């Protein structure tokens, strides 16, 4: 079974830690955000990555493109305006099934 990883600042990640998620990448700078995303992309055991929406904007275009094109891990951004439709599309892309139908 694939794991869930979280990338965010300490305030963002604390709730996930309390929920029992152990693959946490706490970041406090733009450089740490890039490094954390690069690290999680190298892992074969992570299926979903939860990341703050604003952090995606701080990634280099090449890295953002890689995230968009990969099926696994699937990146789910939290705190943006995409809402349910964005999450629906990401899940459909990851597993090949539209769970809302």
Curated annotation (Swiss-Prot):
Self-association and partners: Has multiple subunits with at least A(3), B(3), C, D, E, F, H, I and proteolipid K(x).
Annotated localization: Cell membrane
Species lineage: Archaea, Methanobacteriati, Methanobacteriota, Archaeoglobi, Archaeoglobales
Single GO molecular function: proton-transporting ATP synthase activity, rotational mechanism
Keywords: ATP synthesis, Cell membrane, Hydrogen ion transport, Ion transport, Membrane, Transport
Family per similarity comment: Belongs to the V-ATPase F subunit family.
Transmembrane segment boundaries: none
Function field: Component of the A-type ATP synthase that produces ATP from ADP in the presence of a proton gradient across the membrane.
Pfam family, one: ATP-synt_F
GO aspect biological process, one term: proton motive force-driven plasma membrane ATP synthesis
Primary localization class, coarse: membrane
Cited HAMAP family: ATP_synth_F_arch
Disulfide partners: none
Membrane topology: Peripheral membrane protein
InterPro entries registered for this protein in UniProt: ATPase_V1-cplx_f_g_su (IPR008218), ATPase_V1-cplx_fsu_bac/arc (IPR022944), ATPase_V1_fsu_sf (IPR036906)
Organism: Archaeoglobus fulgidus (strain ATCC 49558 / DSM 4304 / JCM 9628 / NBRC 100126 / VC-16)
Name the record gives this protein: A-type ATP synthase subunit F
Gene Ontology cellular component annotations, sorted alphabetically: plasma membrane
């Amino acid at each position: 079974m694939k794991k869930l990883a979280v990338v965010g600042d300490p305030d963002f990640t604390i709730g996930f830690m309390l929920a029992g998620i152990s693959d946490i990448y706490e970041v406090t700078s733009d450089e740490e955000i890039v490094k954390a995303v690069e690290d999680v992309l190298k892992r074969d055991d992570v299926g979903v990555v939860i990341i703050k929406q604003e952090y995606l904007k701080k990634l280099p275009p090449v890295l953002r493109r890689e995230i968009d094109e990969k099926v696994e891990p699937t990146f789910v951004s939290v705190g943006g305006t995409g809402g349910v439709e964005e999450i629906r599309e990401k899940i459909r892309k990851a597993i090949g099934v539209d769970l809302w139908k």
